[in-house]
Amino acid sequence: MMTSKRILVADDSDTSRGVLAKFVAQRDFDVCEAVDGEDTIEKARKLKPDLILLDVAMPHTNGIVAASVLKDLLPNVRIVLFTMYTEAIARAFPRTGLAADAVISKGDGMEKLEECVQSLLR
């Protein structure tokens, strides 16, 4: 029997986090949630997820910093920045220097997110 992949959903918005967690759970992934960057790092350390859906604009530790820390802690974890700030991220972080496997705009919708998640977890 194949164990389901674990996805950590990190967003400081209860609404966004809830929608993402439900979306992930409906696709038979094991889902856990984090409310900010520090919580994400702590939970990732304990739970060792296969993939982290990470908002960028979060309190305490933002998603960019958290992604870098997470890649150091868990080099094999896949990280998707799911954010409204894709253009700013593209300008600020050329292809090198961003510790995320993908950046998806919240405006692109769930279909694109699902394609990205499925691709990264193959």
Language model region names:
Residues 14-32:
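Two-component/phosphorelay signaling modules centered on CheY-like receiver
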